[in-house]
A protein has these predicted regions:
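Bacterial N-terminal signal peptides that target proteins for export
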Residues: 1-9
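Metal-centered catalytic cores of metalloenzymes
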Residues: 18-74, 78-147
Length: 147
């Protein structure tokens, strides 16, 4: 009897693990967001970032192009609400130049997981002439995209 219970528990575990282990996909469209009129002359470009959440590990990768000056810094930020700016929570890597790639892997806290699922995390790319941010993009779930 005990052997059957252990066997049933093992089978149930094998069935449940793949469901919980599915990765969720997120996407951000990077675009310029001028803070004031003076910034309109210094910011330009576009890009996109795809993020995969597996457990509490968020892996980001993306591209950007057509910046007016070279990229300097790219970070993951947390806004207090959707589409509101907030503090940086992690550094990402950019290849530099006026076009390139973005990459990073971050272990998210419970609070950051909640922020991600509620659209409060965003990617911000800075450039030489736009040190306060050149491109922004909020991470939103890709509907139906689980791995």
């Amino acid at each position: 009897m005990t052997r059957r219970i252990w066997l049933a528990a093992a089978c149930l575990t094998l069935l449940v693990l793949p469901i919980g282990a599915q990765a969720r996909q997120y996407r951000a469209r990077l675009s310029p967001v001028p803070i004031d009129v003076a910034m309109q002359a210094t910011i330009a470009g576009s890009g996109s970032v795809t993020a995969t959440l597996a457990g509490n590990t968020l892996t980001l990768s993306g591209t950007y192009k057509d910046l007016r000056t070279a990229a300097t810094v790219v970070r993951l930020h947390r806004g207090p609400r959707v589409a509101m700016r907030g503090p940086a929570v992690a550094d990402l890597k950019a290849t530099g130049g006026t076009m390139g790639t973005i990459a990073g892997t971050i272990e998210l806290t419970k609070e950051q997981l909640d922020d991600l699922s509620n659209g409060r995390l965003y990617v911000q790319l800075h450039s030489e002439k736009a040190p306060d941010g050149n491109l922004w993009g909020w991470l939103f779930p890709q509907e139906g995209k689980k791995q």
